[in-house]
Amino acid sequence: MGLVDSLLGKDARKFLKRKDSDAAEAGRALEELRSSLYNELKTSEGAKRQQQRFCGPVVAMSFNFVVAVGIILANKLVMGRVGFNFPIFLTLIHYTVAWILLAFFKSLSLLPMSPPSKTTPFSSLFSLGAVMAFASGLANTSLKHNSVGFYQMAKIAVTPTIVLAEFVLFKKTISSTKVMALAVVSLGVAIATVTDLEFNLFGALVAVAWIIPSAINKILWSNLQQQANWTALALMWKTTPFTVFFLLALMPWLDPPGVLLFKWDLTNSSAILISALLGFLLQWSGALALGATSATSHVVLGQFKTCVILLGGYVIFGSDPGFISICGAIAALGGMSVYTWLNLPGKSIDHMSNKQLPKQNVTVSKPKAEADDGGGETGVTVVSVDPLLSKTITANIV
């Protein structure tokens, strides 16, 4: 060491000591950050704060959009080239893999803490798990028995159903300008995508029956996260077992026989596993988006994806959906832009009208007794997978 010190010199030794000190400080800072995040995950309120901090509306919806496009390609491979024509069983595999991954996270203490059981009734979690299974299963069955156009019409009907359901359940209303923007979006998507309306009686009944579970599913995911301090992963952990149970019950009724005769070789199994991993990410990203925004905004995101796929195919791959379809997609994107602008902070009509009202200062003299008691003033300050690329794509509803 003496020889090394003599070769390095005094200045070099000081430099190395300073570097060691900086590295130690960086290590301590990283350890403190890790410890802080770990402690935050130990309470539902802390976990909720971390989710809101790292997964705001833009991040969550972008994450959901990218994963949704990826699973379209994966499921097209599985259902088309691989020939796995069992959409309910594929959805069951997706949720089973998600459950296994969540159990792995829990074993490593990486799963966020759930709120106290008394804050959320067991019936709410059970209902959400059941609704998820029916929304996924009925969506796949509708796509199997109806044309893409009729399936898309049922999908568009989810938007007004959500608005009506939120009014009935929570007395939640939206402004007339938002209603008009949503109407433009729905009409534009209908013009862009509904090219045929072929269906049979059974398929039509399934499509109509799917609308309500799909709407309620989105509303419950959004409401439980925003009102009851649930995080996406914690809620997935609690509800996925119920979803798996109901999918097992639906599979004999909605899937064709012969799943055990399928060729489960390495190539086919790998493709199905990749689809399942993307299905987990789709469920997680969809839950994050619903927790960060609202059920209506999540539906608009799905319609945005539809328009982007249609216009992207026209611009990039030279497909020709027709002039009317292109105009419909552009109109829908315009409606989405207006709806997004109206949801920005301070852009609502009510907020703007309140800002225009003159403020009046009113002085009220309080009785002496009330003043002596310290009385003060208080102020009160509120897997769907798009079917356009292929009719054989399964849907994972979140």
UniProtKB/Swiss-Prot annotation:
It is a multi-pass membrane protein. The chain crosses the membrane at residues 54-74, 84-104, 119-139, 150-170, 179-199, 201-221, 242-262, 271-291, 299-319, 322-342. Its main location: membrane. One of its GO terms (cellular component) is membrane. It is found in: Membrane. Keywords: Membrane, Sugar transport, Transmembrane, Transmembrane helix, Transport. Belongs to the TPT transporter family. TPT (TC 2.A.7.9) subfamily. This is Nucleotide-sugar uncharacterized transporter 2. It comes from Arabidopsis thaliana.
